UniProtKB/Swiss-Prot annotation:
<keyword id="KW-0548">Nucleotidyltransferase</keyword>
<feature type="binding site" description="in other chain">
    <location>
        <position position="61"/>
    </location>
    <ligand>
        <name>UDP-alpha-D-glucose</name>
    </ligand>
</feature>
<feature type="binding site">
    <location>
        <position position="196"/>
    </location>
    <ligand>
        <name>Zn(2+)</name>
    </ligand>
</feature>
<dbReference type="GO" id="GO:0008108">
    <property type="term" value="F:UDP-glucose:hexose-1-phosphate uridylyltransferase activity"/>
</dbReference>
<dbReference type="InterPro" id="IPR005850">
    <property type="entry name" value="GalP_Utransf_C"/>
</dbReference>
<feature type="binding site">
    <location>
        <position position="332"/>
    </location>
    <ligand>
        <name>Fe cation</name>
    </ligand>
</feature>
<dbReference type="GO" id="GO:0033499">
    <property type="term" value="P:galactose catabolic process via UDP-galactose, Leloir pathway"/>
</dbReference>
<feature type="binding site">
    <location>
        <position position="330"/>
    </location>
    <ligand>
        <name>Fe cation</name>
    </ligand>
</feature>
<feature type="binding site">
    <location>
        <position position="313"/>
    </location>
    <ligand>
        <name>Fe cation</name>
    </ligand>
</feature>
<keyword id="KW-0808">Transferase</keyword>
<keyword id="KW-0119">Carbohydrate metabolism</keyword>
<feature type="binding site">
    <location>
        <position position="52"/>
    </location>
    <ligand>
        <name>Zn(2+)</name>
    </ligand>
</feature>
<dbReference type="GO" id="GO:0005737">
    <property type="term" value="C:cytoplasm"/>
</dbReference>
<dbReference type="InterPro" id="IPR001937">
    <property type="entry name" value="GalP_UDPtransf1"/>
</dbReference>
<feature type="binding site" description="in other chain">
    <location>
        <position position="200"/>
    </location>
    <ligand>
        <name>UDP-alpha-D-glucose</name>
    </ligand>
</feature>
<dbReference type="InterPro" id="IPR019779">
    <property type="entry name" value="GalP_UDPtransf1_His-AS"/>
</dbReference>
<keyword id="KW-0299">Galactose metabolism</keyword>
Length: 382
């Protein structure tokens, strides 16, 4: 840290990705906890569940039947948050009347996908090897490539992709969209409605708030300094090492300086990668290795099925050449657990009304996660 005194005093830290601040209160880690505790997650699941709408061969809510897939499978969400077919909503926003100023709305079209990680109902990414995770990353890449606007400079890169042939082809959209958000909610504590290992990909005609804020900040930084914000940040973290959890030749996992969640991590490529389609075959495998390392260490930390929300931020599907070039691929992991398998962090009170706050410092979290290397804890129990 810049000054060891920050280990003991309350202070604020700046997040250059979102142009925001958070309060850090390391002295509060000693306070007793008498609040809510989460129930321990169920850990015994069958390899196949005849009632699960994600297992191979089963029927889904809308009546469609899943194929007997062997690796990954993607389909349009039966309960999509956005739709491809709906009336256009056009409103004149140029008027200065109060309704136009204060009651603004914007129509959003899109399509939401569900993508399974494995045909097995009882595994998570932490249980899978990097080679087992790789087909999911390949499928993410196909899905992203299929949705790129023809005018996007990345379309030419996507056309040269050589991905392994898959029995389950990635869906193709009916329209061009602005952004694709790939994310996973793992565990009931994060609102996951089905324990079968899966993620989602939502494509929208508008730019969502979080990646939009990051793209604005990355553009400003590059304009001011002539370099990429995250490239400079990686250089700094690799030199200092105190927040580096793990790394391989292509990726580094850090507990970011500005982390809000207790054991939040950021997965970053060591070279400028704009989007999934920029990754080489070896880099996709090394990304799978990074994801496996993060999720295994999470589970080992409190010896539980560690809940989290994770997501990929990358270049838009449709954007100017400059906007695409400003983008820097990265993956966020936001886990809620704080002290044990049953005590989680709540974003309430001061954090809702004022600004984000954390107790354990990212440097302390890094030390804890580094120590969670090794075999997955539950494999030692069997």
């Amino acid at each position: 840290m810049p000054d060891k005194i920050l280990d003991d005093i309350s202070h604020r830290r700046y997040n250059p990705l979102t142009d925001s601040w958070l309060l850090v209160s390391p002295h509060r880690t000693k306070r007793p906890w008498q609040g809510q505790q989460e129930g321990a997650a169920v850990t015994t699941l069958p390899e196949y569940d005849p009632k699960c709408y994600l297992c191979p061969g089963n029927s889904r809510a809308a009546g469609d039947q899943n194929p007997n897939y062997e690796q990954t499978f993607a389909f349009v969400n039966d309960y999509s948050a956005v739709k491809e077919q709906q009336p256009d909503y056009e409103v004149d926003q140029s008027s200065d009347d109060l309704e136009s100023l204060l009651l603004r709305a914007q129509g959003v079209k899109g399509v939401c996908y569900v993508l399974t990680f494995s045909p097995k109902h009882n595994v998570t990414l932490a249980d899978m090897s990097a080679k087992d995770i790789l087909p999911t990353i390949n499928h993410w890449t196909r899905l992203y490539a299929n949705h790129l606007s023809p005018s996007n400079p990345l379309s030419a890169v996507a056309a040269q992709l050589q991905l392994p042939i898959s029995k389950e082809e990635a869906p193709v959209p009916k329209d061009n969209y602005r952004y694709m958000q790939i994310f996973e909610n793992k565990g009931a504590a994060m609102g996951c409605s089905n324990p079968h290992p899966h993620c989602q990909a939502w494509t929208t005609s508008t730019m969502p708030e979080e990646p939009g804020k990051e793209l604005v900040q990355m553009a400003k930084y590059r304009q001011q300094h002539g370099r990429h914000l995250l490239a400079d940040y990686i250089k700094l973290e690799l030199a200092k090492e105190e927040r580096v959890v793990w790394q391989n030749d292509s990726f580094v996992v850090v507990c970011p300086w500005w982390a809000i969640w207790p054991f939040e991590v950021l997965v970053l490529p060591k070279r400028h990668v704009r989007a999934l389609v920029d990754l080489t075959a070896d880099e996709r495998l090394q990304l799978a290795e990074a994801i496996q390392e993060v999720t295994r260490r999470y589970d080992n930390l409190f010896e539980c099925h560690f809940p989290y929300s994770s997501g990929i931020h990358q270049a838009p599907l449709d954007g100017t050449p400059e906007e695409i070039e400003n983008a820097y691929f990265h993956m966020h992991f936001y886990p809620p657990l704080l002290r044990s398998a049953t005590v989680k962090k709540f974003l309430v009170g001061f954090e809702l009304m004022a600004e984000a706050q954390r107790d354990i410092t990212p440097e302390q979290a890094t030390i804890r996660l580094r120590a969670c290397d090794g075999e997955l804890y539950r494999n030692k129990l069997s």
